[in-house]
Amino acid sequence: EVFPFIKNLGAEDETTYSHHMKDARFTIPTPALLTKVVDLVADVPMDDKDTKGDIYEYMLGKIASAGQNGQFRTPRHIIKMIVELMQPKPTDTICDPACGTAGFLVAASEYLNDHYSTEIFANPEAAKRFSEETFFGYDFDSTMLRIGSMNMMLHGVENPRIENRDSLSEAHSHIAEKYSLILANPPFAGSLDNESCAKNIQ
């Protein structure tokens, strides 16, 4: 019962998270181990709104730093520095074309929350824009799409536009002008299909 509940969070609103969780598999092998995990998490004080996101990011740090397809997790302090240098505004449309765990998008959402919370939650329309029309992330790894959408949800952005897309492909080379701010650590390692790669970045 637990895993179907987790998979279906946000399903009634057709959120990004619920979309990417449809095909997820539950890999905790026994009920006893799940009980132990739940008990450990239950002991963590959750009064601070940032705690869930902080725990999640800590667990992400335990994942191998390099995965398949050239995935690298950008260190948190580097992400934070880049976001602070770029100073995103509530009017920005922010994109990470190789989002992975959505670290840049999370940091941008935290920056906006810290500096513009009155503006972004001034009315239902502004809050909806923040949740649904501000953050765009693309990746072609289904696990990363799940992790990224869950990371955003745990940090208060319930329905970002996180989609399955190869940003380097010719098919998506026309979208650059759609965004006012692009934050990214491009996939420098891994294989690249030169045939499908956009001409302007070959």
Label every PLM stretch briefly:
Residues 1-90, 161-170:
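Non-catalytic, mostly N-terminal accessory regions of nucleic-acid modification and defense proteins
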Residues 71-184, 189-191:
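Conserved S-adenosyl-L-methionine
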Residues 1, 190-193:
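Tryptophan-centered motif/residue detector
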Residues 193-202:
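A mobile, often basic/glycine-rich helix-loop segment
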